[in-house]
Amino acid sequence: MSHNTVIPTTDISPKPDPARPRKAQRDAAQEFINSIQGVTFPNSRRIYLQGSRDDIQVPMREIQLSPTLIGGTKEEPQYEENEAIPVYDTSGAYGDPDAKLDVHVGLTQLRQPWIDERQDTEPVAALSSDFTQQRLTDAGLDHLRFNHRPHPLKARKDKRVTQLHYARQGIITPEMEFIALRENMGRERIRGDVLRQQHPGQSFGAQLPENITPEFVRQEVAAGRAIIPANINHPESEPMIIGRNFLVKVNANIGNSSVTSSIEEEVEKLIWSTRWGADTVMDLSTGRYIHETREWILRNSPVPIGTVPIYQALEKVNGGAENLTWEIFRDTLLEQAEQGVDYFTIHAGVLLRYVPMTAKRLTGIVSRGGSIMAKWCLSHHQENFLYQHFREICEICAAYDVSLSLGDGLRPGSIQDANDEAQFAELHTLGELTKIAWEYDVQVMIEGPGHIPMQMIRRNMTEELEHCHEAPFYTLGPLTTDIAPGYDHFTSGIGAAMIGWFGCAMLCYVTPKEHLGLPNKDDVKQGLITYKIAAHAADLAKGHPGAQIRDNAMSKARFEFRWEDQFNLALDPDTARAYHDETLPQASGKIAHFCSMCGPKFCSMKISQEVRDYAAGMEQMSEAFRAHGSELYHSVEDVSHEQSA
């Protein structure tokens, strides 16, 4: 990677082209990340909500709106100002035009002072992973290496450094205060009654306070109902929370494979993901240079990063699942924990006795991690070594504050297999493992399916809450039908909105490439926009305080034909503007009181405004009628007297 480090207001990098040679694709990504600067969306500005201490500044995006025409004349129109709309922002420094960015140096270590002042960590005397030490001494990797790698920390002897530990001790950390400000979304800035109106929700038992306080955050984490993924070796991340009593979150998957992609392309996808609303990102790399790719991603990520460590462990044994050992896996956990991975997906619930339950399935075991562990169990006719060594896994996680995402290795891969014996047997085991992890103050969330028809979705949520003790649920979709390859972001978005409403805390996006290939950056955007819609729809249905503000602002702008405001309030302003301009590209189209769907004579909103004006005129006439005593006829003298007055 060459030096000098920009995300333009709109994407200027060449569109992915399957026919373009691999080197050209990589060069395009390199050009993109090496010309990066902080920008925000059209007519938006970066604001910071100030906490109780100088170094708690929570980034938000504020959408500036144009005023509403309320009367006057053509020469002297009268306007009423519209309030700016604050929205949750995951883009970190990449959304701040004043930020100094260089991917070769990495992001500012926001959380480092908070970690240091707790005085419960220390630098590792020597890197704990043999594999890491080998990589760092390999001169052949120098051209790929991130050169500003920090020295890793771990917990001091007999100390716990997890956010769950602090919460249980009654300690409100700066991370918790940061999150409380962030979850409230600056809605206290909104004064207008029209914008603040909201329908009551159906929360299915979720507790949604009108104002989220740092103490509420602490209580939810202490109870295990929420997690704060925040490895002490990823101080660049901005604190966020995953739990059903908070905003529904969205995860994006990136990662290279043995077939395609490069470090440059994955860093580009990371930045792209945070721009379009990824609350967390999972690096699912399975090809060469996994270690080096992950270092670049972590040092440049403002959001928590998750991984599936078994993927890299499998690479270390050249793809032979039967050759995996606990020692290799343990070394991989230490390697990733000291790099700064915030949460691990661990398939510890795939037990030997559950594997035969999948024999009668239509699609068998579709989870990569699940199939790897099933093959290992059958090859050795032994119990899953992740299950056998789970307490040791927890000890490692507790030393670095790595959260556990207990993987659903037996999730259904087709709607025919939904809600079967194998799926729920594993889920119940994940509940047992959750209690063990909590013994070590390790934060836990539970992964869920998968392919589930709509009428069977809610049972997944109720089973998880009951058997996994209300630990946060994190699902892939679920996909509600199997007939739409190329459109599985739609089929899964339906299920995601439903299960988010029922209480799922985080939704793992699905891209149009699901079941077809490795997603490029355009697919990442499509998947994220789809899932931001699903998450927001779930927040509205649950009745999350303030969730409807942006919808109300959009509806008001739509009724008043403020086209630019409509574009800017959209989740994807560029696409909204482009679709409008396909048929009305002229500047006059941005002030017209109609669009190309209905035209000027059939616009329902224009007609509705005319009806309102007519009704207002009728009301004035009615008032005048009542003022005259409700008499139909008046003497000429009375009328003449009024006219002269």
Swiss-Prot record:
Substrate binds at N253, M282, Y311, H347, S367, R368, G369, D408, G409, L410, R411, E447, Y474. [4Fe-4S] cluster binds at C595, C598, C603. InterPro entries: ThiC, ThiC-associated_dom, ThiC/Bza_core_dom, ThiC/BzaA/B. Its cofactor is [4Fe-4S] cluster. The keyword Mitochondrion does not apply. It catalyses: 5-amino-1-(5-phospho-beta-D-ribosyl)imidazole + S-adenosyl-L-methionine = 4-amino-2-methyl-5-(phosphooxymethyl)pyrimidine + CO + 5'-deoxyadenosine + formate + L-methionine + 3 H(+). Binds 1 [4Fe-4S] cluster per subunit. The cluster is coordinated with 3 cysteines and an exchangeable S-adenosyl-L-methionine. Its EC number is 4.1.99.17. Residues 1-25 are annotated as: Disordered. This is Phosphomethylpyrimidine synthase.
